[in-house]
Curated annotation (Swiss-Prot):
Gene this protein is translated from: sodC2
Function in brief: Destroys radicals which are normally produced within the cells and which are toxic to biological systems.
The protein's Enzyme Commission number: 1.15.1.1
Signal peptide positions (record): 1-20
Name of this chain's protein: Superoxide dismutase [Cu-Zn] 2
């Protein structure tokens, strides 16, 4: 039993060491009507930024594009104020594009039959460390955006993902 407790304690120590407790952020997501529909917690890890997303009021049973956009501004109803995908290295769009991806490109998310999503996504291309080229805390900020359709992971500039239906400024 002592051996098991020691292994468990050591495992927990390793897991907690992979997260930087000082580097966290959050975003409150709104829909095109300006209503709060969810939240995201962002945590710096040794492998990138872990994004824990919890939202409701999205299209049911849908595959939706989920990106980080280059401006920390979410003006409904179009959210065009968030500008394009966060792309500090000037790459092409898409996780499947040999000349990509943008730092803000992430896997699609999936909603349940009620339009809810609860997911954790690790983005290895970004950081919460201020002053870094790929920092989400750059001048002008950044935002999380959910689109009305799936990202095809290759079409430039945005993966044919459809309209922007939710947005949250990363703080």
């Amino acid at each position: 039993m002592k051996k098991l407790s020691g292994v468990l304690a050591g495992s927990l120590l390793l897991i907690s060491a992979s997260f930087s407790q000082d580097l966290k952020a959050h975003a409150e997501l709104i829909n095109t009507e300006g209503e709060v529909i969810g939240k995201a917690e962002l945590i710096e890890t040794n492998s990138g930024v872990l994004i824990k997303l919890n939202a409701k009021g999205l299209p049911p049973n849908a595959e939706l594009a989920f990106h980080i956009h280059e401006r920390g501004e979410c003006k409904p109803p179009t959210f065009k104020s968030a500008k394009g995908h966060f792309n500090p290295y000037g790459k092409k769009h898409g996780l499947l594009n040999p000349e990509g991806p943008h730092a803000g490109d992430m896997p699609n998310i999936y909603t349940d039959d009620k339009g809810n999503v609860r997911v954790q996504v690790l983005n290895p291309f970004v950081t919460l460390k201020k002053g870094e080229k790929n920092s989400l805390f750059k001048e002008g900020g950044t935002a999380l955006v959910i689109h009305s359709g799936p990202d095809d992971y290759k079409s430039d500039p945005a993966g044919n993902a459809g309209k922007r239906i939710a947005c949250g400024v990363i703080r």
